[in-house]
Amino acid sequence: MAKKIVGYIKLQVPAGKANPSPPIGPALGQRGLNIMEFCKAFNAKTQGMEPGLPIPVVITAFADKSFTFIMKTPPATVLIKKAIKLDKGSSKPHTDKVGTITRAQLEEIAKTKEPDLTAADMDAAVRTIAGTARSMGIVVEGV
């Protein structure tokens, strides 16, 4: 018989830097899950990734206090800022432009994000990422 699911916990945790402090500790503690077990497993899985890169994770909590977790790809905004070496997007995206991104950079980001995107093909994925870049006040070239 399958385990009974008591809930889902969605967090963004920096790669390789999971520790019991907030937000992880309180979120897992409320469900009675072993916080250190999650931290060790998450840090082991993110060992090869760039340290500090925020990784969205969905934790499934079961009635017997066990859990599983699924890691997603980093947010598109983080990948875009990293690609064009930007600290933050524009506070007025349609007026103040803060940078420029090329189609090649967008394709690279779309390949990284492909497992999480619902786009039918690579061109649609690139257009999705381009829309995100535009909403951050970044000029998109070649799309």
Curated annotation (Swiss-Prot):
Coiled coil ranges: none
GO cellular component, one term: cytosolic large ribosomal subunit
UniProt entry keywords in alphabetical sequence: Methylation, Ribonucleoprotein, Ribosomal protein, RNA-binding, rRNA-binding
BP GO annotations: translation
Family matches, as Pfam families: Ribosomal_L11 (PF00298), Ribosomal_L11_N (PF03946)
Post-translational events: One or more lysine residues are methylated.
A GO MF label: large ribosomal subunit rRNA binding
SMART domains reported in the protein's UniProt record: RL11 (SM00649)
Organism superkingdom: Bacteria
Family the entry assigns: Belongs to the universal ribosomal protein uL11 family.
Subunit structure: Part of the ribosomal stalk of the 50S ribosomal subunit. Interacts with L10 and the large rRNA to form the base of the stalk. L10 forms an elongated spine to which L12 dimers bind in a sequential fashion forming a multimeric L10(L12)X complex.
Purpose: Forms part of the ribosomal stalk which helps the ribosome interact with GTP-bound translation factors.
Protein name from the UniProt record: Large ribosomal subunit protein uL11
Record organism: Thiobacillus denitrificans (strain ATCC 25259 / T1)
